[in-house]
C-alpha cells in the first residue's frame, strides 16, 4: 500500500534522513521518501503487517508530528518578520552593552561601565535580559533541538541549542561569581557570552528566514495551480442553474461556465464559445479561442463570455488534479544524486557533537596558559564554534532546493516531471525515439488531392456522409474538406465499421440505396483501375457490387503535415549528440519522407505496437539510454519500456501514469527544453554539494583552532554568521535556475 502524509517539526536534512533511516529498518516498510521542503512523506508498506496509524506512532516516538493533512500554521502574536526584527534589535542592544566600552568608554553611561563589581553586575544582568528575549524569539530551535536529542535523532537545531545553552550556562556561572565577589582583582571580572548567544541566534534566524522565503517562492507553482481549482461549479438541471461541489460532478453533467470563472473539470463545449487562458498548461500567455466541440480543461480560465460544457472527466481524474499530483510527487521525491548527502547527513550531527566535545577536552588539556579559567573559556569558545559553524542545512538543501526551483521553471515552460529521478535522468539520454502522428505531425491529416471517377461533389458527398460517423482523425480530415466545399450530406443507414480497414453504409447513390465503402486498399476487392503514385495517406471510396467485387468511385490523398518548427528543434536535439529514430505505423513512403524532411537518423514504417517495443528493447540492449516521445494514447507499452517517457499532450488526452515527463504545450521544443533543464539542474546541484562539502571540510577544523598559532581563531558569533551564509548561499545559487533560458541555437 502507498500513502502520502505530512510531517511537522523537521528543521534540517538530519530530521528527514533520520525518519527515513528509522522506518526504513522496519521489515514491513518497502520504501519511504521524506521531503524536508514539502514537510511530506511518501511511504510504501505491507498493509498485512501494519497500518498508517502504527506508522504515525513510530514517527511520533522520534519527536515529530505526522498528519494526514497539512494543518494551517498557528497564528502567532508576532509575524516571522517582526520576530526577526525584534531579534536584531535586542541583539544590537546586547552587543552595545558588551562591546560598547571597547570601542569608546563614552558610548556607555558610567553606571554600565565594567569598572567595579556593581556596574559589571548591572551590565551583565541587562545583557542576560536581552539574551533571554532573543532566546525566547528563537525558542523553536530549543524545543525542536532538545526534543530531537531526547529521541536520539539530533539535528541542526540540536547543535544550535547545545552550543548556545553551553554559552549561556557558562555566562550565568560567571555572573554568579561576580555576584558573590569571587573576583578580587577589579580587572578580572566575569567573561560573558551573552552577545555570542544573541548573535548566533540572530544570524541563524536571518538565514532560516531567507531559506523559508525562497522555499515559498519555489512552491508558488503548486500554490498557483491549487488556487485555480474551483470548489464549486454551476450545474444545469431542468434548465436551472444549481451550485454544486466540484467533487460531486460526474461524467456527462452539463455545466455552465461564466465569464471570469475557472473550468471545474475537463469537458467539451456544447453551446456557446469563449477565449480561455491556458497558460497553466502550455506556459503561453495568449488566450485560446474555443467553440462548440472543442475540449476545455480544468483550471483554465474563461475570459469574457459564458458557455455550456459537458463534463468528460470527474474532478479526481481531471487535468488539473493530475498536474498537481505530478508536481507534488516531483517535489517530494528524491534524486539519486541526493543519496550521498543523505548518507553524510545521517551521521553528520552526531559526528559534529563528538568533534566539539573532543576539541573542548583537548583545548582544556593543552591550552598554552596555566590559568584554568582562561583555558576553560578558550575550550568553551571552540566547543560552541564547532557546534554552530557546522551546517547540515547546506548539505540538506543542496539537492531538494534545486529540484524545487527546476520544477517551478519547468511548469512555466509547460513541462511537468513525474519525479526527481525523471528530471535527473533526462540529461543522460543519448537516443530519442519519436512517434509520428500527433507528435512530429499535427495529427490532423488534410486532403492533398482527389482522384475521382464520378462527379467530384458527389464523391465528396458520399465520403463525408459516411465518414461523419467515424471518430478517426483521417475521417475528420475528409469531412472538414467536404464541408468547406459545401458538399451536401446524405442520409445513411446500416453503418458497419471494420477496425483498421474502413467503414461502410447504405447511401442513396444514383437513385438507389447502395453500400458505399470508405477505407484503405485492403478494405476492397483488388483495385487496378486507378494508379496513384503520390506519397500520402490513401483513402478509397467504392461501391459494393456484390460480396466479391467492388467498383472504384475515387480516392483521397491526405497528408499529415509536420508541426511548425519541428525540423529546427530536431536539429537542436541532434546537436547535443543524440541519435534520433522515427517509429510509425504509417506506410514506408510516408515515413521515409517524414524522416528525410525532418533530418531524423533512422526510421521504421508499418510498425505495430510490438515492433516499437522490440526496437526500444534492442536499443537498450546496446547500452543506449532511450527516451520515447509519443502522445500516450496507443504507445503505452513503448513508453513504459523506455528509460524516459515523454508524452506530448493536450489536457486529458493523456494519462500521466504512462509518462515521466508531460508536455502540455504539445511542442517538440519541450523535449530539448527538458534535456537542457535537466543538465542545468544537475550542474546546479553539484555546485551546491561542492560548496556544502568544502565549507564543512574547511570551517569545522578552523573552528577547532587548527590555525591558532597563526593567530586565527573563530569566535562563536563569527561561526554563527558563517553557518547562516553557508545555507543562504546554497539557496541563492539554486534560485539561479529561475533565470534558466532555452537558447534557440
Swiss-Prot record:
TM annotation in the entry: 84-104, 125-144, 152-172, 195-215, 344-366, 380-397, 686-705, 717-735
Pfam assignment, any one: Hydrolase
Which top-rank group of organisms is this from? Answer: Bacteria
The residue spans the entry assigns to the Cytoplasmic side of the membrane are as follows: 1-83, 145-151, 216-343, 398-685, 736-745
Top-level EC class as recorded in UniProt: translocase
What are the positions of the active site? 435
A molecular function annotated in GO for this UniProt entry is:
ATP binding
In this UniProt entry, which cysteines form S-S bonds?
none
Question: What EC number(s) has UniProt assigned to this enzyme?
Answer: 7.2.2.9
| Family annotation (InterPro entries) | ATPase_P-typ_cyto_dom_N, ATPase_P-typ_P_site, ATPase_P-typ_TM_dom_sf, ATPase_P-typ_transduc_dom_A_sf, HAD-like_sf, HAD_sf, Heavy-metal-associated_CS, HMA_dom
Extracellular side of the membrane: what ranges? Answer: 105-124, 173-194, 367-379, 706-716
- HMA domain mapped to chain residues: 1-67
This protein's membrane topology, according to the annotation, is: Multi-pass membrane protein
- Which residues take part in binding Cu cation? 12, 15
Q: Which coarse location class describes where this protein primarily resides?
A: membrane
Biological process, per Gene Ontology:
copper ion homeostasis
Reaction equation(s) it catalyzes: Cu(2+)(in) + ATP + H2O = Cu(2+)(out) + ADP + phosphate + H(+)
Which GO cellular component does the record give, naming just one?
plasma membrane
Q: Per its UniProt record, what SUPFAM superfamilies does this chain match?
A: Calcium ATPase, transduction domain A, Calcium ATPase, transmembrane domain M, HAD-like, HMA, heavy metal-associated domain
Q: Where in the cell is it found?
A: Cell membrane
Alphabetically sorted, this entry's keywords are:
ATP-binding, Cell membrane, Copper, Copper transport, Ion transport, Magnesium, Membrane, Metal-binding, Nucleotide-binding, Phosphoprotein, Translocase, Transmembrane, Transmembrane helix, Transport
Q: Where does Mg(2+) bind?
A: 631, 635
Family of the protein in this entry: Belongs to the cation transport ATPase (P-type) (TC 3.A.3) family. Type IB subfamily.
Function (record text): Probably involved in copper export.
User: Under what name is this protein listed?
Assistant: Copper-transporting ATPase
Native organism is Helicobacter pylori (strain J99 / ATCC 700824) (Campylobacter pylori J99)
Amino acid at each position: 500500500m502507498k500513502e502520502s502524509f505530512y510531517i511537522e517539526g523537521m528543521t534540517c536534512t538530519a530530521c528527514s534522513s533520520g525518519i527515513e533511516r528509522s522506518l526504513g529498518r522496519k521489515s514491513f516498510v518497502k520504501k519511504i521518501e521524506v521531503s524536508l521542503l514539502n514537510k511530506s512523506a511518501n511511504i510504501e508498506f505491507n498493509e498485512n503487517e501494519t497500518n498508517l496509524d502504527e506508522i504515525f506512532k513510530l514517527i511520533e516516538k522520534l519527536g515529530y508530528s505526522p498528519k494526514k493533512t497539512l494543518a494551517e500554521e498557528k497564528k502567532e502574536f508576532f509575524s516571522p518578520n517582526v520576530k526577526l526584527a525584534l531579534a536584531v534589535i535586542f541583539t544590537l542592544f546586547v552587543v552595545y552593552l558588551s562591546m560598547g566600552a571597547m570601542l569608546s568608554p563614552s558610548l556607555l553611561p558610567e553606571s554600565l561601565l565594567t569598572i567595579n563589581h556593581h556596574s559589571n553586575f548591572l551590565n551583565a544582568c541587562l545583557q542576560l535580559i536581552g539574551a533571554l528575549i532573543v532566546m525566547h524569539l528563537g525558542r523553536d530551535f530549543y524545543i525542536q533541538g532538545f526534543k530531537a536529542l531526547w529521541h536520539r535523532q539530533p539535528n541542526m537545531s540540536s547543535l544550535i541549542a547545545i552550543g548556545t545553552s553551553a554559552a549561556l550556562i557558562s555566562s550565568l556561572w560567571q555572573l554568579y561569581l561576580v555576584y558573590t565577589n569571587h573576583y578580587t582583582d577589579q580587572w578580572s571580572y566575569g567573561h560573558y557570552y551573552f552577545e555570542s548567544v544573541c548573535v548566533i541566534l540572530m544570524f541563524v534566524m536571518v538565514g532560516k528566514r531567507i531559506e523559508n522565503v525562497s522555499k515559498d517562492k519555489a512552491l508558488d507553482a503548486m500554490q498557483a495551480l491549487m488556487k485555480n481549482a474551483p470548489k464549486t461549479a454551476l450545474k444545469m438541471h431542468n434548465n436551472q442553474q444549481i451550485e454544486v461541489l466540484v467533487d460531486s460532478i460526474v461524467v456527462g453533467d452539463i455545466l455552465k461556465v461564466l465569464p471570469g470563472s475557472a473550468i471545474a473539470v475537463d469537458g467539451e463545449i456544447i453551446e456557446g464559445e469563449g477565449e480561455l487562458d491556458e497558460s497553466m498548461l502550455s506556459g503561453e500567455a495568449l488566450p485560446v479561442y474555443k467553440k462548440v466541440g472543442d475540449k476545455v480543461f480544468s483550471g483554465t480560465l474563461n475570459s469574457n463570455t459564458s458557455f455550456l460544457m459537458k463534463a468528460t472527466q470527474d474532478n479526481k481524474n481531471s487535468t488539473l488534479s493530475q498536474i498537481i499530483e505530478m508536481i507534488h510527487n516531483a517535489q517530494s521525491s528524491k534524486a539519486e544524486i541526493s543519496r550521498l548527502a543523505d548518507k553524510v547527513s545521517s551521521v553528520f550531527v552526531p559526528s559534529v557533537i563528538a568533534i566539539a566535545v573532543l576539541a573542548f577536552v583537548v583545548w582544556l588539556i593543552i591550552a598554552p596558559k596555566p590559568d584554568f579559567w582562561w583555558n576553560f573559556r578558550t575550550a568553551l569558545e571552540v566547543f560552541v564554534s564547532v557546534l554552530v559553524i557546522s551546517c547540515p542545512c547546506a548539505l540538506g538543501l543542496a539537492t531538494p532546493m534545486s529540484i524545487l526551483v527546476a520544477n517551478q521553471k519547468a511548469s512555466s515552460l509547460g513541462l511537468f516531471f513525474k519525479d526527481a529521478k525523471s528530471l535527473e535522468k533526462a540529461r543522460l539520454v543519448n537516443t530519442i525515439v519519436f512517434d509520428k502522428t500527433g507528435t512530429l505531425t499535427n495529427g490532423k491529416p488534410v486532403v492533398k488531392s482527389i482522384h475521382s471517377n464520378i462527379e467530384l461533389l458527389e464523391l465528396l458527398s458520399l465520403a463525408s456522409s459516411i465518414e461523419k460517423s467515424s471518430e478517426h482523425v483521417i475521417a475528420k480530415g475528409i469531412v472538414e474538406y467536404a464541408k468547406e466545399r459545401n458538399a451536401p450530406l446524405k442520409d445513411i443507414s446500416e453503418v458497419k465499421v471494420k477496425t483498421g480497414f474502413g467503414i461502410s453504409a447504405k447511401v442513396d447513390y444514383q437513385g438507389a440505396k447502395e453500400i458505399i465503402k470508405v477505407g484503405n486498399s485492403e478494405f476492397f476487392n483488388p483495385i487496378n483501375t486507378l494508379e496513384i503514385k503520390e506519397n500520402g495517406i490513401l483513402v478509397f471510396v467504392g461501391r459494393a457490387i456484390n460480396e466479391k467485387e467492388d467498383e472504384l468511385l475515387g480516392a483521397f490523398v491526405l497528408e499529415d503535415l509536420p508541426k511548425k518548427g519541428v525540423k529546427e528543434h530536431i536539429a537542436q536535439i541532434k546537436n547535443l549528440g543524440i541519435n534520433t529514430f522515427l517509429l510509425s505505423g504509417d506506410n514506408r513512403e510516408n515515413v521515409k519522407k517524414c524522416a528525410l524532411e525532418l533530418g531524423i537518423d533512422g526510421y521504421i514504417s508499418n510498425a505495430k505496437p510490438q515492433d516499437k517495443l522490440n526496437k526500444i528493447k534492442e536499443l537498450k540492449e546496446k547500452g543506449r539510454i532511450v527516451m520515447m516521445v509519443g502522445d500516450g494514447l496507443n504507445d503505452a507499452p513503448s513508453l513504459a519500456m523506455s528509460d524516459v517517457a515523454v508524452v506530448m499532450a493536450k489536457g486529458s488526452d493523456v494519462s500521466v501514469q504512462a509518462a515521466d515527463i508531460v508536455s502540455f504545450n504539445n511542442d517538440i521544443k519541450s523535449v530539448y527544453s527538458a534535456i537542457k533543464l535537466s543538465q542545468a539542474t544537475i550542474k546546479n546541484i553539484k555546485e551546491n554539494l561542492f560548496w556544502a562539502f568544502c565549507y564543512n571540510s574547511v570551517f569545522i577544523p578552523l573552528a577547532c583552532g587548527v590555525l591558532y598559532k597563526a593567530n586565527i581563531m573563530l569566535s562563536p558569533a563569527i561561526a554563527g554568521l558563517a553557518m547562516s551564509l553557508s545555507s543562504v548561499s546554497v539557496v541563492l545559487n539554486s534560485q539561479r535556475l529561475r533565470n534558466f533560458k532555452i537558447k534557440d541555437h
